[in-house]
Amino acid sequence: SNYGKLLRVDQYPIQNYVILDFVLDTGNAAGQNMVTLAAKVACDYIKEKTGADFFLESGFNSDKKASARNMIMGRGHSVIAETTIKSSIVQRILNVDISELEKYQELGPTTSRLAGTQGTHLHISNALTAIYLATGQDTACVAENSIGHFQIESVNDGVKFRLTLPSMTVGTVGGGTRLLAQQQNLKLLGCHEGENSSKKLAEIICASALALETSLLSALASDTFTKAHMKYGLSLI
């Protein structure tokens, strides 16, 4: 591999099995295929030396699946985005009072826990899917990457919006990033080159998701959610 560097191999014994979790730094690549190939070579070597059988994929890495493991331990990039908006701007642009935002914030996480959903957010997957398609990412990874934690906090003369995305498998080299249109979009974002270009892309995606979470929260709290859909969606059909 031109990008992969083995950091460690974690061991998780269960029943009469041992799960080996290969942890790699994949540079600016998302790295799923890279890790798979590296793990195959390592497991073949272990089998040759010990005679132990193995399955390359156990499901423990939660690839393309939402899991508590990836929320806690992360997979790929982990990003926290935060912004503070003044009360006057919240009222003028988002058309909502901070007190209404706080009321909805009390309700949303409670009902989500009742439903058994993972994470506390509204629709992170919308932002991720759009940008993943535009920048050549593996859109199937939205299933695991869209689990996050959205929070608001009242501050002096404003409100702080905060979003944590603990598991983002994105890259700026390899895979769909080689496509011409996707390369052009990465250039527009300033993520087509540089040592930390994949980190920058992850930050942009998280910030975009935060903006979308803020918008939907405001629409729901101010009871304008349906109105917006009727004006910009159904009325055009």
List the predicted regions and their residue ranges.
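Flexible, glycine/charged-enriched surface loops at secondary-structure junctions
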Residues: 2-11, 49-61, 100-104, 138-146, ...
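Short secondary-structure boundary micro-motifs
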Residues: 10, 115-116, 192
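Hydrophobic alpha-helical segments with strong N-terminal bias
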Residues: 15-16, 120, 197
